Design a protein with these regions (language model features):
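Conserved, well-structured core domains of diverse proteins
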Residues: 1-128, 134-138
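Hydrophobic transmembrane alpha-helices of multi-pass solute/ion transporters
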Residues: 53-60, 118-205
Length: 205
């Protein structure tokens, strides 16, 4: 009897201290399935099979976008907003939105390359009909910051946010580090649609 109580107490303590959800049943199967599919995708992409069979070949940026899409989906299903909280409708919705923001790059990569980012150079102040890339890119950045907060913690989010703010408000910084500042279009376009920012070397590796 005492052993059973001790086990329950230990289980509750581990659940409270763990940053991840204690998934069971259908939720566990869904998360495990997504993780397995992600792993298979990574193995396929890194293998010579796409070149041998001439199928399933991915360019660099679309492949990285798919990778981040899987990561964001799992992040919101595994890491709760608050410790011990079960998967909510909000978690499911935000995971799908985050994945869509990434997969947009995969599905419309050729159009993005053909347009050369022309839409993203339209100043926001002159056009209230924001380009879809600007909307999805902004959402993607915010969702990525929230996923980072859940999985790693607030300090890294604060650091990343400071650099984003510095990029936008650079003209107001001390003279020694000041710059002209990026428009919202250019900032989002660079961060979300370029291989030198979010989809850079860390994801590529």
């Amino acid at each position: 009897m005492n052993q059973s109580i001790d086990d329950k107490v230990d289980s509750r303590i581990k659940e409270d201290l763990s940053p991840t959800r204690n998934l069971t049943g259908l939720h566990l199967k869904i998360v495990a399935s997504i993780a397995i599919i992600w792993s298979l995708f990574q193995l396929w992409y890194a293998s010579p099979f796409p070149f041998w069979f001439n199928i399933g070949m991915f360019k660099g940026l679309p492949a990285r976008a798919i990778h981040l899409g899987f990561a964001l989906t799992l992040a919101f299903l595994i890491y709760p907003t608050f410790k011990g909280k079960k998967i909510s409708i909000f978690d499911i919705i935000i995971s799908f939105v985050g994945a869509f923001c990434c997969l947009y790059i995969y599905f419309f990569y050729d159009q993005l390359v053909d347009r050369g980012g022309v839409l993203l150079n339209i100043p926001v102040s002159e056009n209230f009909n924001l380009p879809v890339e600007l909307i999805l890119g902004s959402l993607g950045i915010l969702i990525l910051l929230e996923a980072t907060r859940r999985a790693i913690g607030l300090p890294l989010v604060i650091i990343a946010s400071c650099f984003l703010l510095f990029s936008y408000f650079g003209r107001y910084a001390p003279e020694i580090i000041s710059h002209g500042g990026l428009s919202l279009n250019r900032l989002v376009g660079f961060q979300w649609l370029d291989q030198e920012a979010i989809f850079g070397i860390p994801i590529g590796v």
